[in-house]
Amino acid sequence: MPNLEPAVVVPTSEAIAVDLTKLEEKLAPADSFLDRHLGPGETEQRQMLQTLGFDTLGDLIDQAVPPAIRFPRSLQLPASQSEYGAIAQLKSIASKNQVFRSYIGMGYYDTITPPVIQRNILENPGWYTAYTPYQAEIAQGRLEALLNFQTMVMDLTGLEIANASLLDEGTAAAEAMALSYGVSKSKANAFFVAQDCHPQTIEVIKTRANPLGIEVIVGDHHTFSFSTSIFGALLQYPATDGAVYDYRSFIDKAHQHQALVTLAADPLSLTLLTPPGELGADIAVGSTQRFGIPLGYGGPHAAYFATKAEYQRKMPGRIVGVSKDAHGNPALRLALQTREQHIRRDKATSNICTAQVLLAVMASMYGVYHGSTGLKNIALRIHQLTVLLAIGLKRLNYSLNNDYFFDTLRVGVGEQSAPAILKAAEGRGINLRPLVPGEVGISLDETVTVQDLLDLWQVFAGKDNLPFTPEELWSEVKTSFPADLTRQSLYLQDAVFNQYHSETELLRYLHQLESKDLALNTSMIPLGSCTMKLNATAEMMPVTWPEFGKIHPFAPAGQTEGYQILFAQLEAWLGEITGFDAISLQPNAGSQGEYAGLQVIRQYHLSRGEEQRNICLIPESAHGTNPASAVMCGMQVVPVKCDGEGNIDVEDLTSKAEKYGDRLAALMVTYPSTHGVFEATIGTICDIVHRFGGEVYMDGANMNAQVGLCRPADFGADVCHLNLHKTFCIPHGGGGPGMGPIGVKSHLQAFLPRTSLNSTAELQAEDQSIGMISAAPYGSASILVISWMYIAMMGPQGLTKATEVAILSANYMAKRLENYYPILFRGNNELVAHECILDLRPLKKQAAIEVEDVAKRLMDFGFHAPTVSWPVLGTMMVEPTESESLGELDRFCDAMIAIYQEAQAITHGEIDPADNPLKNAPHTAQSLICGEWNHPYSQEEAAYPAPWTKQFKFWPAVGRINNTYGDRHLVCSCEGMEAYKEG
């Protein structure tokens, strides 16, 4: 009989998906990350638009952004995800990384981050959302932590001065080369690098040396005869293969030939080994990664740089120094800033802006928590385990090819056995380092246990049953250093390293320091050109996942599939956002991005036989890193004028381009301009440069005004760096970390930074890459997850809306303040971009009030000042970002208006011109209640100048700091701070 049952229709997966979408539309709306990221809600946006005279946000954007550069379509990116959904997807990607025990070394080690440090610094917005401590009175906590860092480095290295961190060990070594080149009395043009330095450091050195015309000689320090004149030398201590050498003889010979010597030294080893300063080294560099900082597939980590006092004014990077405030109390500040790029520009010691403050703070607190005894015990334990491992390997008939070592063994295994040993190790979840054929390296760290040694012995034995027990071998364990390389000098004797060893004490110390700093968890930080937007918690959470944090940067590619997926997606997304054909994620700071981009342009010209192209045109308004980076690339800087409206003077640009013709290499331009406007002539500007054979480098500092509205590659840029720590939500960390990846058009793609150390000499000869510009192939890889999360959660519409609201907020503030402070520059239809410049010069003329007075008075209102006196002296540049609510914008505007009124009171003779709230700001709690109050204004006017300060008061920790005194009496260690306190 026929089957009369109705046929069952099975819906297709596509049909089910459509039904689910329809059902989803009927449900109450899900939580939107965009609503969490934006400060002003829809109602507040309408109020702001009404103030500006616009009906819709689209109307404002149409008037503000030049039509010629508008992006004609929506960004083609994945749809936005919820916080929960994005975390789940990223967790799935992370799971594709394989977390092995990596004993590869090369300056990177697994480590133990003390939970009290992870929870209260790395995961604490009170630390990671602060800005570089230019406004020192409200950054005393961070500055003290950095002073601890400097002291720790000076003590461990035995040198007289240290900076507050650099980007990584490789670039720190390159900076040492540059310093040596600048101060050496030798007329030589060659720099010697020992062949047993870390290979990535050698690569970075070569990259840096090339455009400066420096010859890099890589050789054996044992046999180098100094018959070739050199200005400096770099040695690894201990060497990359683990060997510990006494470098005294080499250093003495170098000094006889007027060359400076840099030791790249592992700071943990220096608790046991004679420090570089005592060996005679002029400079010491290295990484503090193993002081509690996760591997993170290469970063971020805080490098250090220490040298002799005579070179302090030539040293790169930030230096924290001790000074005193207006009341005579000790106070900390950034010292010797006249060395730096934001002042010295093309004559600066380096293009480094900020570095790795958050990581330096963590490393310093690792030192504080453990103290000298704790650090020495960690080092001694690692060394003892290494010696124990060596004894066992000898019992297994393997040769050890170094006489002395700290934590790394160079094991002779034979060429035929090496592949099997490496494979056996991999089978047990262990990474070893292949050295020369027939040798492997094993580098131990503080996470290693005796069980790990058993696993290693079994790898080399080829079986589980060993002919010995660890206990049997212990009696043979002895220190493996000669007496003259065993440290005798004391270190970390200052009180701070000897009183916070319980978690309770350290927790309170960290809280005390944090409470002295104003970060985004207190109030807005409206710094122009800095984009201090929300760093959402969901974006930050994955940074500490072990699937990202415990991966060695030179782990086998098969173990890093998750990272490769992350990189590929992020590169594709950034390419779509900017219009560029290729992205390099290697630059680990904006300054590094600038350097990489200009190097790419230089290499492109060289590949075409146009080596004469060395002129870099830079607008007078440009950030100081621009000319500093150009000089580092061997270019000659030629400034271009700006017109009265703050735009690039097209006539002057044309004249300069014609003048230099076939010598023109590049134009560096920021867009929107550093004056806070969309220049309508940007397309014409790019065309002029291209007409004369130059390339256009765009500084991406102001990309937050472009995302979704226009794309730099579309209107003429050939290369651009992106500040992921601005536009794409990586936090500033109080002065780092940052990331500065670059995007390029297809004709420049071949010249991007190299990501492999394993290419042969033949391949490198064919390779057109500029080489490595950071020590790790993907820079500070672990924080790229932050930008991935931001883009994934915002989606294409959300990213565009964020840009629009950032422009709305800036124009709203400009409108509210224009009757009190002239808005110096405006663009299309009298509108600004995402920031605006307030002209404070009338206050100086009328009431003798300086920009500094306003900046310090804002602290009494609970605000960090906008960018001061840049790009125009006597002004403030304000950038509110899209993340600040209307209430917060109004509070800041009210504070600025109140300050204007205080200045007017001086002008009208109502307040003493010398003794007033502006000149005496900031006001500390101590200054209000200790001693007599002899000022002609009340304590309430001083400390509670606005209603919101009575609801919550942020107190500056010190009064106004005497900057001149600090530079004239330079003290850069805790010892100096203690002396001040005693005095």
From Swiss-Prot:
A family per Pfam: GDC-P
InterPro entries in alphabetical order: GcvP, GDC-P_C, GDC-P_N, GDC_P, PyrdxlP-dep_Trfase, PyrdxlP-dep_Trfase_major, PyrdxlP-dep_Trfase_small
First-tier enzyme category under EC: oxidoreductase
N6-(pyridoxal phosphate)lysine modification, residue list: 726
SUPFAM superfamilies: PLP-dependent transferases
Positions in coiled-coil regions: none
Keyword annotations from UniProtKB, A to Z: Oxidoreductase, Pyridoxal phosphate
Purpose: The glycine cleavage system catalyzes the degradation of glycine. The P protein binds the alpha-amino group of glycine through its pyridoxal phosphate cofactor; CO(2) is released and the remaining methylamine moiety is then transferred to the lipoamide cofactor of the H protein.
Protein name per UniProt: Glycine dehydrogenase (decarboxylating)
Organismal lineage: Bacteria, Bacillati, Cyanobacteriota, Cyanophyceae, Synechococcales
